[in-house]
Amino acid sequence: MSMKGISSAESDKLSRRISLTHKRNSEELDVFEAAVYFGYNEASSGDHGHTQKYGYNAAREENPRRWGILGGGRRISLDLPIRCSEQVYHLQQDHHEKHEVTTIKERLGNVRHKQPSSPGGKIASFLNSLFHQAGSKKNKSKSKSKTKPTDPEVEEEIPGGGWMRRRRRSSISHFFSSSRSTSTTTTTTASSSSKSLISSSSSGFRTPPPYLNTPTKNYKQFLNYTSATKQVGEEETKTNKEYSWLDEKLKVMESLSENQRIWSDDEDIDDDRRIKREGEDDGMESDSSSDLFELQNYELSRGGLPVYETTNVANINKTHI
C-alpha cells in the first residue's frame, strides 16, 4: 500500500490512535469520544474498501469494551445512551431557561418606577419616605407593646421636624408584676427550704437552708444614715463652740452698756446743775440792762419828748446830736 492511497481521513485516524496509545501508557481514564465513533462510520462510506476495514479494526482495537467485545463477543448498541444523554441535556437546558426567566421576573418586580427629576417630585418622594419610615416604626413599637405588655418602661417614637424623639413612660403594671415576682420567689424559696430540710432529715445529714437575697441596699442605706447623723452631730458641736464665744462677747457688751448708763446718769445730773446756775446768772444781767434802758428813757423824757416815741431810732439820734 503506497502513501498516495492513504487519504487525509486515515492520517487523522492514525494520529488519534497514537494519542490513545499515549493515554493508555499514562494510565488515564478512557472517555467515550462521539466524534471518533461517528468519524469511523463516515469513513466507512468511502470508496476504498481497505480504508473501511482499517477504520473498523482500529476502532475495535482501541476500545474493545465500548464496542461490546467482551467475554461473549456480543455487540452493544450505543444509540440508547446517546438518546438518554440528549434528553437529559434538553431537560437541563429547559430548567436553566425557566430559572433565568423567573430571576428576570423577580428583578423586574423589584425594580421601582423612576420618578420625575423635578424638585416637586423629589420633595414628594422625600415626604413619602418619611411617612413610610414613621409607619414602619409605629408598627414595630405596637408589636413590641403586644409582645411585652408588662415592661417597666415603654419607648414611644414621635416624629417631629424630620427627627425622631423618644419618650419613656413608666407603667403601673410593673409594680404589680414585681410584687407578684417577689411573692413567687418567697414561696419558691420556702418550698425549697422545706424540701432541703426533709431531705436532710431523711438522709441523716443536716444542710443549712438556702440564704435569701442579702439586703445589701438596706445595709448601705443604714450606713449612709449613720454617717449622716455623725456629720450632723459634729456640725452641731462646731456651732455650739462658735456660739459660746459669741455669748462671751454679748456679756462684755452688756457690762459696757451698764457702765455707760451710769456715766450718762451722772452727766445728766451735772447738766441740770449747770442749767440752773446759768439761769440764775441770766436773770441778774437782764435786770441791769433794763435799768440802763429805763435811765435812757428817763433822759429822753426830760427833753420834752413823748414817751411813746422813744423807741424810734431817728428820734434817738436827733437827741444825741
From Swiss-Prot:
Main location: membrane
UniProt-listed InterPro entries: BG1-like
Keyword Membrane: yes
Keywords: Auxin signaling pathway, Cell membrane, Membrane, Transport
Residues spanning the membrane: none
Biased composition annotated in UniProt, kind: Low complexity: 172-206
A GO BP entry: positive regulation of auxin mediated signaling pathway
Bias type Basic residues, positions: 135-147
Region feature Disordered, mapped onto this chain: 134-217
Top-rank lineage group of the source organism: Eukaryota
Localization terms from the record: Cell membrane
GO CC terms of this entry: plasma membrane
Protein family according to the UniProt entry: Belongs to the BIG GRAIN 1 (BG1) plant protein family.
Function as written in the Swiss-Prot or TrEMBL entry: Involved in auxin transport. Regulator of the auxin signaling pathway.
Name of the protein in question: Protein BIG GRAIN 1-like E
